[in-house]
Amino acid sequence: MYILGINCAYHESSVALVKVIGNNWKLISFVEEERFNRKKRAKPALIDNCDVLPHQSLEWTLERAGINMEDIAHVATSMNPEKRQKQNTEHDHGYEIEANGFGTIEGEEKFYKSTKNIEKKFRGLGFIGQFHFLNHHDCHSASSYYVSGFTDAVS
């Protein structure tokens, strides 16, 4: 089974591919889009470009593994749009924020829609497996634990 991780909600767009056989998780590849487009951080972090996929990283990863989108069982992105929208709109920030930007109701709605569009874009590329929106910081832990070979760890 193949699991593809994608980070594209902000900057530093990247793709990671893991192959899972039983309890053995093997990292096949990890690559950041900036290695292909030669732009530091790959893209600007804007309120409405969360769904700009790292296409060159994705193509390179699939080619390197010798697989197609149909071979991937799960795609996970390191952004949970529901959690983020709730966290960023239900309290006073205590500082001035730009109108229609990050942290405003209007801006967070744009961010939410753009983030939710990531799955649609993957479906358009032929992905037929399960899509997951995960909590960002949990992804940091998972990315090191599951491929570590350890059966027990503190994160």
List each model region and its residues.
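Short acidic/glycine-rich loops and adjacent helix/strand connectors
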Residues: M1-S155
